[in-house]
């Protein structure tokens, strides 16, 4: 099953477990958000919206918020010794589509648990090693200043 959704003025074709980058939306990392503007539900019997499919939504997990690549806007007026350089970076939210919901259902899949990184102590890397003493510098005398 697939769906075509609209968010941030753009349209995306999504299937469950898709990872997509969209314009920034509200939501903490790791939470489930619902996107409600579903234009098409596809599958065995496709459903076209007019303009949206009633009761359909997409459940997606927020993976991260980041900034997109820098876009440079450069304007030059020839023979006028005039130019302007500006740049900006879009705010982006990375989502993983968890499920496609029809008929006003609520999400059944929660956020995925984060994997704990096991930190194992390395043998032989203890803090019992003798430390080297700091190197002492000679004090300046009046003869050195001349």
From Swiss-Prot:
GO terms for molecular function: rRNA binding; structural constituent of ribosome. InterPro entries: bL21-like (IPR028909), bL21-like_sf (IPR036164), Ribosomal_bL21 (IPR001787). Residues 103-146 are annotated as: Disordered. Keywords: Ribonucleoprotein, Ribosomal protein, RNA-binding, rRNA-binding. Transmembrane segments: none annotated. GO terms for cellular component: cytoplasm; ribonucleoprotein complex; ribosome. It comes from the Bacteria. One of its GO terms (biological process) is translation. The keyword rRNA-binding applies. Part of the 50S ribosomal subunit. Contacts protein L20. PANTHER family: 50S RIBOSOMAL PROTEIN L21, LARGE RIBOSOMAL SUBUNIT PROTEIN BL21M. This protein binds to 23S rRNA in the presence of protein L20. Belongs to the bacterial ribosomal protein bL21 family. HAMAP family: Ribosomal_bL21. NCBIfam families: L21. This is Large ribosomal subunit protein bL21. The lineage of its organism: Bacteria, Pseudomonadati, Pseudomonadota, Alphaproteobacteria, Hyphomicrobiales.
